[in-house]
Amino acid sequence: MHPTDPSQPLGERLQGTNLYLVGMMGSGKSTVGPLLAKALGYRFLDADAVISQAAGCSIPEIFERDGEEGFRQLERQVLQQLSQWHSLVVATGGGIVTVPANWGELRQGVVIWLDVAEEELMRRLQADPGGRPLLAGDDPAGRLHGLLEKRQPLYGQADLRVSAQGEGASDISERILQQLPGLLKAPGAPQTTAP
């Protein structure tokens, strides 16, 4: 089967290639991801949930115990394991793009950035404030702004950028599904290299 043959179902044309959803906390990765997985006949995994299960504690507890560096090391190990599997839609943690080595695994799949404006992110995060250690403390809006400034250029290296606001998760999922065929490569085409 040829991955660019439009007569084949999209899930088959992907040939098990994983989809990695990247974007800021609150961008909708864990909401859109299961819809994509269902449409493609894939399995959905939330990387933060896998990390929590592996560590035996919550993400805030990992940050408190091991700091951000310890969390990023565990996140890297989980990504390395997940990249060995196939037919997954993975909602990654918002900071996964900040570790250059992670791009090697991410580039083995299709990287999709769910982009949300800063004001909308703040609104969403205020509505659901739990478990966000990087926003803890004084001035969460200032912290969010700083994280966005650092991460947006990294998110911009994704294969696909999708605005994830102003419509429901099912509409966002459908737009991603419509754009995926344009990202499929013919056999023998050069692979995208890590940044």
Curated annotation (Swiss-Prot):
Subcellular location: Cytoplasm
Entry binding sites for substrate: 48, 72, 94, 151
One of the protein's GO biological processes: amino acid biosynthetic process
Cofactors required: Mg(2+)
Keywords: Amino-acid biosynthesis, Aromatic amino acid biosynthesis, ATP-binding, Cytoplasm, Kinase, Magnesium, Metal-binding, Nucleotide-binding, Transferase
Coiled-coil regions, chain positions: none
Metabolic or biological pathway, per its Swiss-Prot or TrEMBL entry: Metabolic intermediate biosynthesis; chorismate biosynthesis; chorismate from D-erythrose 4-phosphate and phosphoenolpyruvate: step 5/7
EC number annotated for this UniProt entry: 2.7.1.71
Cofactor-binding details, from the entry: Binds 1 Mg(2+) ion per subunit.
InterPro entries in UniProt: P-loop_NTPase, Shikimate/glucono_kinase, Shikimate_kinase/TSH1, Shikimate_kinase_CS
Protein task: Catalyzes the specific phosphorylation of the 3-hydroxyl group of shikimic acid using ATP as a cosubstrate.
Quaternary state and interactors: Monomer.
Classification via HAMAP family: Shikimate_kinase
Protein name in the entry: Shikimate kinase
Gene name linked to the record: aroK
